Amino acid sequence: MKSTQLVPILNRRFGTVARRYPALTRWMANRLSTEQFTGLPLTVLCMGMVVTIGTLSEVAENIVKSEMMVRVDMVFTDWLFQGRTSQLSTFFYGLTAFGSAYVTIGIGVLASVGFTYTKRWRNLMILWLLMLGVGAFVRLGKREFSRPRPPAIAYYNVSGFSFPSGHSATAMTLYGLLGYWWTRRLRQTRSRVWVGAATIILILLVGFSRIYLGVHYLSDVLGGYLLGICWLIIGIVLTEWQRTKPDPKHSLA
């Protein structure tokens, strides 16, 4: 719906207030307009960012102060450890590599070659901005919280602190962004659904593999996902912003 169509609706709904503050009414109409990305889509993404940051802050606080979260982490990790099998361990050990630095950087390089060949320079810039950003914040989080990894149950040796999960954060950011770009280029809804579902499944499996292999707690993976979502939202905003030339009528002012 266009902002020009929303203004009369807001005037009817809010009456005196809307007529007294016409500039505010136009601003609200622009924020709810579906005609431009800077309208309702950007509003929803900004709200999603606020909710995600708030949830991430809550999780981070709870791993320090909440005995309940620590207990849930311990119980869930121990339950998976008790049911661990060699076949599934081998499967998840191979799968968890999709969140490793070597594989994600390799995929990023391959994507960069494709973007360079097709001269999609902004995609190239957005990709590495997100990769560097999420990597820096993972390092910052690990150093800030210095949370030890699960004791004596890891399927393989791994160093460093536990919160947040770098594999989960990077998988959410990289595969989420590439999946989003891919679905945007597809015309058939069915194809979009398949690509979107495959992307989500891969991200979830990478995160679950970290818990199953005993190298992260549940809250570590959740924190990694939330951090990755923040950067993914930034990537989506930058993508759509550069595709849409803002109309002065729909500016953020």
Region annotations inferred by a language model:
Residues 95-96, 142, 163, 216:
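Residue-level signal for helical boundary/lining positions with a hydrophobic bias
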Residues 46, 56, 62, 88, ...:
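Hydrophobic alpha-helical segments and their boundary regions
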Residues 3-13, 154-253:
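Membrane-embedded catalytic cores of phosphoryl/pyrophosphoryl-handling enzymes
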